[in-house]
């Protein structure tokens, strides 16, 4: 595995790989790698002959009261995990390399970015999608793999890649969960043992909603309210949002219609740690 820090060098390597007819897959991360990230690499390797991983803690997608400086950066450990997972190139630029003096461009992802995570974290999606487009330009991939856990992020990336005719295939990877159902996340390390136990309520809320949908209920707003009450039953759990949305547009929905795809989405603070989770389903 080759480690590269310079965007121009990475771009030259990617262009050379394309000239050699190598099919390139990219996995973008902020480091602090866990099983969820490694599952993205595995999926990328199943589709691409060459896999590039990026590690960049992007300051422009963190809000003023968020955990940019607290965010874990165990680079040596991450590099070892990437190497053992079969990554071919690890691109790890500095903030100065990505945003040099005079940098002024940003992308507005549109209305989908103003709801839910966008409302809770103003500016987050603009910063996220701008760096994604930059990294696509640097790594020149045919395929990019993103996790379904960040479902709104995935929907926005698909929209922007389509709207801007970028030409990269965007592949969503299933959520990887711990044995008790908690979605893997770099932020799980912030949870105390008691909070870690309470955090399983996110998955319990998903299981409850699935059970109610399986009863052919269509009243999604009511089911979401019941699931939120379950979340609030934990003493340190405080939902930012919990509702059903159209899977493509992330517009809130109150009633299920046969033949449509929906997603239950939630963001919940467990103590001081904010966790997200979701569940996608086709209503038949």
UniProtKB/Swiss-Prot annotation:
(R)-pantoate binds at residues 61, 153. The active site is at residue 37. Its main location: cytoplasm. Keywords: ATP-binding, Cytoplasm, Ligase, Nucleotide-binding, Pantothenate biosynthesis. Coiled coil: none annotated. ATP binds at residues 30-37, 147-150, 176, 184-187. Beta-alanine binds at residue 61. GO terms for cellular component: cytosol. It catalyses: (R)-pantoate + beta-alanine + ATP = (R)-pantothenate + AMP + diphosphate + H(+). Catalyzes the condensation of pantoate with beta-alanine in an ATP-dependent reaction via a pantoyl-adenylate intermediate. Homodimer. HAMAP family: PanC. This is Pantothenate synthetase. It comes from Chlorobaculum tepidum (strain ATCC 49652 / DSM 12025 / NBRC 103806 / TLS). The lineage of its organism: Bacteria, Pseudomonadati, Chlorobiota, Chlorobiia, Chlorobiales. The gene is panC.
